[in-house]
Protein backbone atom coordinates (compact mmCIF):
# COMPACT_ATOMS: atom_id res chain seq x y z
CA UNK A 1 0.00 0.00 0.00
CA UNK A 2 1.47 3.34 -1.08
CA UNK A 3 1.11 6.24 1.32
CA UNK A 4 1.42 9.80 0.12
CA UNK A 5 3.89 11.78 2.17
CA UNK A 6 4.83 15.42 2.15
CA UNK A 7 7.83 16.20 -0.03
CA UNK A 8 10.33 18.30 1.91
CA UNK A 9 13.04 18.79 -0.70
CA UNK A 10 14.08 17.46 -4.10
CA UNK A 11 17.67 17.55 -5.26
CA UNK A 12 19.41 16.25 -8.36
CA UNK A 13 19.74 12.65 -7.14
CA UNK A 14 17.47 12.32 -4.12
CA UNK A 15 14.11 13.37 -2.69
CA UNK A 16 13.44 13.95 1.00
CA UNK A 17 10.00 13.16 2.37
CA UNK A 18 8.47 13.76 5.76
CA UNK A 19 9.40 10.92 8.11
CA UNK A 20 7.07 8.74 10.19
CA UNK A 21 8.27 10.32 13.44
CA UNK A 22 9.40 13.83 14.44
CA UNK A 23 13.07 14.37 13.69
CA UNK A 24 13.14 11.82 10.85
CA UNK A 25 12.99 12.00 7.06
CA UNK A 26 12.72 9.46 4.26
CA UNK A 27 15.51 9.74 1.70
CA UNK A 28 14.52 8.46 -1.76
CA UNK A 29 17.27 7.67 -4.28
CA UNK A 30 16.39 8.65 -7.85
CA UNK A 31 17.77 7.26 -11.10
CA UNK A 32 18.60 10.75 -12.35
CA UNK A 33 22.23 11.33 -13.26
CA UNK A 34 23.61 14.85 -13.60
CA UNK A 35 27.02 16.34 -14.25
CA UNK A 36 28.55 19.78 -14.70
CA UNK A 37 26.00 21.40 -12.36
CA UNK A 38 23.06 19.68 -14.08
CA UNK A 39 24.05 20.82 -17.59
CA UNK A 40 24.27 17.13 -18.53
CA UNK A 41 21.35 14.92 -17.52
CA UNK A 42 20.13 11.36 -18.02
CA UNK A 43 18.05 8.65 -16.37
CA UNK A 44 20.11 5.58 -15.50
CA UNK A 45 17.68 2.83 -14.57
CA UNK A 46 18.65 1.15 -11.32
CA UNK A 47 21.20 3.73 -10.15
CA UNK A 48 19.08 4.77 -7.17
CA UNK A 49 18.69 1.17 -6.03
CA UNK A 50 22.45 0.54 -6.10
CA UNK A 51 23.37 3.83 -4.42
CA UNK A 52 20.82 3.21 -1.67
CA UNK A 53 22.43 -0.15 -0.88
CA UNK A 54 26.04 1.10 -1.08
CA UNK A 55 25.33 4.17 1.05
CA UNK A 56 23.52 2.01 3.63
CA UNK A 57 26.48 -0.37 3.77
CA UNK A 58 29.05 2.41 4.23
CA UNK A 59 27.06 4.57 6.65
CA UNK A 60 26.32 1.54 8.84
CA UNK A 61 30.00 0.70 9.06
CA UNK A 62 31.00 4.29 9.73
CA UNK A 63 28.50 4.37 12.60
CA UNK A 64 30.21 1.25 13.89
CA UNK A 65 33.59 3.00 14.14
CA UNK A 66 32.14 6.08 15.81
CA UNK A 67 31.57 8.37 12.82
CA UNK A 68 28.06 9.52 13.63
CA UNK A 69 25.78 10.06 10.66
CA UNK A 70 22.14 10.53 9.73
CA UNK A 71 21.43 6.95 8.61
CA UNK A 72 18.89 4.99 10.68
CA UNK A 73 17.86 2.06 8.46
CA UNK A 74 17.02 1.11 4.89
CA UNK A 75 13.28 0.89 4.25
CA UNK A 76 13.11 -0.66 0.78
CA UNK A 77 14.95 -0.72 -2.55
CA UNK A 78 15.06 3.03 -2.96
CA UNK A 79 14.48 4.54 0.46
CA UNK A 80 16.13 4.87 3.81
CA UNK A 81 15.04 6.42 7.08
CA UNK A 82 17.38 9.19 8.21
CA UNK A 83 17.70 11.72 11.01
CA UNK A 84 16.55 15.21 10.10
CA UNK A 85 19.50 17.61 10.17
CA UNK A 86 20.16 21.24 9.33
CA UNK A 87 22.47 20.90 6.36
CA UNK A 88 25.71 22.89 6.47
CA UNK A 89 25.86 24.58 3.02
CA UNK A 90 29.24 23.10 2.17
CA UNK A 91 30.62 20.18 0.23
CA UNK A 92 33.73 18.76 1.87
CA UNK A 93 36.04 17.06 -0.62
CA UNK A 94 38.96 14.83 0.36
CA UNK A 95 41.51 14.12 -2.36
CA UNK A 96 44.17 11.41 -2.33
CA UNK A 97 45.11 11.29 -6.02
CA UNK A 98 45.00 14.03 -8.66
CA UNK A 99 41.80 13.84 -10.72
CA UNK A 100 39.00 16.13 -11.77
CA UNK A 101 39.16 19.83 -10.98
CA UNK A 102 42.34 19.77 -8.87
CA UNK A 103 44.28 18.31 -11.79
CA UNK A 104 42.94 21.05 -14.08
CA UNK A 105 43.47 23.90 -11.59
CA UNK A 106 47.01 22.97 -10.59
CA UNK A 107 48.25 21.40 -13.81
CA UNK A 108 48.66 17.97 -12.26
CA UNK A 109 48.71 14.70 -14.16
CA UNK A 110 45.59 12.62 -13.58
CA UNK A 111 46.51 9.67 -11.39
CA UNK A 112 49.40 11.47 -9.70
CA UNK A 113 49.42 10.71 -5.95
CA UNK A 114 49.10 13.86 -3.85
CA UNK A 115 51.76 14.59 -1.18
CA UNK A 116 49.07 13.94 1.44
CA UNK A 117 45.30 13.85 1.62
CA UNK A 118 43.96 17.33 0.84
CA UNK A 119 40.64 18.73 2.09
CA UNK A 120 38.74 21.31 0.06
CA UNK A 121 35.50 23.17 0.78
CA UNK A 122 32.89 24.16 -1.80
CA UNK A 123 29.89 26.41 -1.20
CA UNK A 124 26.69 24.59 -2.15
CA UNK A 125 25.04 26.77 -4.79
CA UNK A 126 24.25 25.35 -8.22
CA UNK A 127 23.69 28.79 -9.75
CA UNK A 128 27.23 29.77 -8.77
CA UNK A 129 28.68 26.42 -9.80
CA UNK A 130 29.53 25.36 -6.22
CA UNK A 131 32.58 27.66 -5.87
CA UNK A 132 35.61 26.59 -3.89
CA UNK A 133 35.91 28.54 -0.63
CA UNK A 134 38.35 28.87 2.26
CA UNK A 135 37.87 28.62 6.01
CA UNK A 136 37.95 32.44 6.06
CA UNK A 137 34.91 32.58 3.77
CA UNK A 138 33.11 29.93 5.82
CA UNK A 139 33.48 31.74 9.14
CA UNK A 140 33.02 35.25 7.70
CA UNK A 141 29.67 34.34 6.14
CA UNK A 142 28.61 32.20 9.12
CA UNK A 143 28.21 29.03 7.08
CA UNK A 144 29.93 27.15 9.90
CA UNK A 145 31.78 27.94 13.12
CA UNK A 146 35.49 27.28 13.59
CA UNK A 147 34.81 24.30 15.85
CA UNK A 148 32.38 22.86 13.29
CA UNK A 149 35.04 23.20 10.58
CA UNK A 150 37.53 21.35 12.79
CA UNK A 151 34.96 18.63 13.48
CA UNK A 152 34.05 18.25 9.79
CA UNK A 153 37.71 18.01 8.78
CA UNK A 154 38.44 15.43 11.47
CA UNK A 155 35.43 13.32 10.45
CA UNK A 156 36.26 13.64 6.75
CA UNK A 157 39.79 12.36 7.36
CA UNK A 158 38.46 9.51 9.50
CA UNK A 159 36.06 8.58 6.70
CA UNK A 160 38.97 8.75 4.25
CA UNK A 161 41.12 6.41 6.33
CA UNK A 162 38.31 3.90 6.74
CA UNK A 163 37.08 3.96 3.14
CA UNK A 164 40.61 3.81 1.70
CA UNK A 165 41.15 0.56 3.59
CA UNK A 166 37.69 -0.81 2.85
CA UNK A 167 38.03 -0.26 -0.90
CA UNK A 168 41.69 -1.34 -1.04
CA UNK A 169 40.57 -4.67 0.38
CA UNK A 170 38.38 -5.27 -2.68
CA UNK A 171 40.83 -4.00 -5.30
CA UNK A 172 39.54 -0.43 -5.58
CA UNK A 173 41.51 2.80 -5.12
CA UNK A 174 39.70 5.68 -3.40
CA UNK A 175 40.86 8.64 -5.50
CA UNK A 176 38.68 11.28 -3.84
CA UNK A 177 35.20 11.75 -2.42
CA UNK A 178 32.65 14.38 -1.40
CA UNK A 179 30.69 14.41 1.84
CA UNK A 180 28.17 16.74 3.43
CA UNK A 181 27.38 17.42 7.06
CA UNK A 182 24.35 18.54 9.04
CA UNK A 183 23.64 19.92 12.48
CA UNK A 184 21.61 18.10 15.09
CA UNK A 185 20.40 20.08 18.08
CA UNK A 186 20.45 18.85 21.66
CA UNK A 187 18.99 21.50 23.95
CA UNK A 188 21.04 24.68 23.58
CA UNK A 189 23.86 22.88 21.81
CA UNK A 190 24.38 21.53 18.31
CA UNK A 191 26.91 19.20 16.72
CA UNK A 192 27.69 18.22 13.16
CA UNK A 193 27.21 14.69 11.86
CA UNK A 194 27.77 13.09 8.47
CA UNK A 195 24.76 13.38 6.12
CA UNK A 196 23.75 12.94 2.45
CA UNK A 197 25.19 9.75 0.87
CA UNK A 198 28.42 7.94 0.08
CA UNK A 199 28.25 6.08 -3.23
CA UNK A 200 29.88 5.98 -6.67
CA UNK A 201 28.00 9.24 -7.30
CA UNK A 202 30.09 10.97 -4.65
CA UNK A 203 33.42 9.07 -4.85
CA UNK A 204 36.04 8.56 -7.52
CA UNK A 205 36.77 4.84 -7.49
CA UNK A 206 39.36 3.21 -9.74
CA UNK A 207 40.21 -0.45 -10.19
CA UNK A 208 43.55 -0.84 -8.43
CA UNK A 209 45.12 -2.94 -11.20
CA UNK A 210 43.74 -1.35 -14.38
CA UNK A 211 42.74 2.16 -13.16
CA UNK A 212 39.37 1.56 -14.82
CA UNK A 213 36.87 4.11 -13.53
CA UNK A 214 34.01 2.62 -11.52
CA UNK A 215 32.19 5.85 -10.65
CA UNK A 216 30.24 8.84 -11.96
CA UNK A 217 33.11 9.84 -14.26
CA UNK A 218 31.83 7.12 -16.58
CA UNK A 219 28.74 9.30 -17.05
CA UNK A 220 30.62 12.62 -17.07
CA UNK A 221 33.03 11.42 -19.77
CA UNK A 222 30.62 9.28 -21.80
CA UNK A 223 32.58 6.10 -21.07
CA UNK A 224 29.44 3.95 -20.95
CA UNK A 225 28.62 0.99 -18.67
CA UNK A 226 27.74 3.27 -15.75
CA UNK A 227 25.28 0.90 -14.06
CA UNK A 228 27.56 -2.07 -14.71
CA UNK A 229 30.41 -0.25 -12.94
CA UNK A 230 28.25 0.78 -9.97
CA UNK A 231 27.07 -2.82 -9.71
CA UNK A 232 30.68 -4.02 -9.79
CA UNK A 233 31.47 -1.81 -6.78
CA UNK A 234 28.48 -3.28 -4.93
CA UNK A 235 29.50 -6.81 -5.96
CA UNK A 236 33.05 -6.38 -4.65
CA UNK A 237 31.72 -5.05 -1.36
CA UNK A 238 29.55 -8.16 -1.09
CA UNK A 239 26.29 -6.22 -1.29
CA UNK A 240 24.94 -7.40 -4.66
CA UNK A 241 25.82 -10.34 -6.84
CA UNK A 242 24.24 -9.01 -10.01
CA UNK A 243 22.52 -5.99 -11.49
CA UNK A 244 19.27 -5.31 -9.62
CA UNK A 245 15.84 -5.95 -11.03
CA UNK A 246 14.47 -2.43 -10.96
CA UNK A 247 11.22 -1.91 -9.12
CA UNK A 248 9.84 1.61 -9.12
CA UNK A 249 8.69 1.30 -5.53
CA UNK A 250 8.71 3.63 -2.60
CA UNK A 251 6.77 6.21 -0.71
CA UNK A 252 5.78 9.20 -2.85
UniProtKB/Swiss-Prot annotation:
It comes from the Bacteria. Pathway: Purine metabolism; IMP biosynthesis via de novo pathway; 5-amino-1-(5-phospho-D-ribosyl)imidazole-4-carboxamide from 5-amino-1-(5-phospho-D-ribosyl)imidazole-4-carboxylate: step 1/2. GO terms for cellular component: cytosol. GO terms for biological process: 'de novo' IMP biosynthetic process; cobalamin biosynthetic process. InterPro entries: SAICAR_synt/ADE2_N, SAICAR_synt_PurC, SAICAR_synth, SAICAR_synthetase, SAICAR_synthetase_CS. Keywords: ATP-binding, Ligase, Nucleotide-binding, Purine biosynthesis. GO terms for molecular function: ATP binding; phosphoribosylaminoimidazolesuccinocarboxamide synthase activity. This is Phosphoribosylaminoimidazole-succinocarboxamide synthase 1. The lineage of its organism: Bacteria, Pseudomonadati, Pseudomonadota, Alphaproteobacteria, Caulobacterales.
Amino acid sequence: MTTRRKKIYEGKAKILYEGPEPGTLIQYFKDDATAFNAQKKAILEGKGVINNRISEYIMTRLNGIGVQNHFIRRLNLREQLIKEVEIVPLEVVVRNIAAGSIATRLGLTEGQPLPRSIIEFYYKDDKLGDPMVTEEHITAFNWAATQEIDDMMAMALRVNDYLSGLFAGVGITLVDFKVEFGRVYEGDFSRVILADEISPDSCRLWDTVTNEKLDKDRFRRDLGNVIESYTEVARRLGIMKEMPTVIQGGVH
